[in-house]
Design a protein with these regions (language model features):
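N-terminal secretory signal peptides that target proteins for export/translocation
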Residues: 1-15
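N-terminal propeptides
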Residues: 32-57, 76-112
Length: 223
């Protein structure tokens, strides 16, 4: 479906879009505090894959979102003294990332602006805009049992005509070693980075309920 470029520009810079942009620009810019890592952060995935490959951690990385608590549990038993070079740098980045993301009791705001001349319909693992222009804002809060992640996106001239989108919004609750979540969560299944034949992020997330383990440690019995 082709769009008139002049109409697209006028739509993106409409008074409503400008008002939302100015309003969100007044919000402090910080990252979210979330116990689940959604697909999109290519550097985090590369660091985790490297640490997996050299035997520092042992966590499944083929079904996203992944549990950061699982990564933390594996990382805290690692012997960092034997690391050097790229492995040491990856270890430090992941450790700092976990310290920030798993901090509890603090509400955090975030704001993003993305523009793309030719949005990709076939998307890879890396987070990319689905439309020609997007303004995104969110609020997240985490404690020892519950998580709330609110996200709203205004899209310029979207393909499906839905200008306001709740993609990324979800609420969750820890139930023992399980995390129960409900909302619009991005999912990625498979080892690929340029695409997934199982489940990828080409389509926008649909509302659903997800139950996954917080820690991937093996069961104590064979049953």
């Amino acid at each position: 479906m082709l769009h008139d470029p002049v109409q697209t520009i006028d739509s993106f810079f409409s008074p409503r879009a400008w008002f939302l942009t100015v309003l969100l620009a007044c919000v402090p810019l910080t990252a979210a505090a979330l116990p689940l890592a959604a697909p999109g952060d290519m550097r985090l995935r590369h660091d985790l894959q490297l640490l997996n490959d050299i035997g520092v951690i042992n966590v499944p990385l083929t079904a996203w979102p992944i549990s950061l608590g699982d990564v933390h549990n594996s990382l805290k038993t690692a012997d960092a003294s034997r690391l050097s070079g790229a492995g040491k740098e990856a270890y430090n980045r992941v450790r700092d990332h976990l310290a920030w993301e798993l901090e509890t009791g603090t509400a955090r705001y975030r704001f993003g602006l993305a523009v793309s001349e030719n949005p990709r319909f076939i998307r890879g693992f890396e987070n990319e805009p689905r439309e020609e222009g997007e303004v995104t804002a969110g609020l997240s809060w985490l404690d020892n049992r519950f998580v709330i992640n609110l996200a709203a996106t205004y899209a310029s001239n979207p393909f499906d005509d839905e200008e306001f989108q709740p993609d990324g919004t979800y609420v969750g609750m820890a139930l023992g070693n399980w995390m129960l979540t409900a909302g619009w969560q991005e999912r990625w299944w498979g080892p690929g980075r340029d695409g997934s034949l199982i489940l990828g992020t080409n389509a926008k997330p649909t509302p659903g309920i997800m139950l996954q383990r917080n820690l991937s440690t093996p069961f104590e019995t064979k049953w």
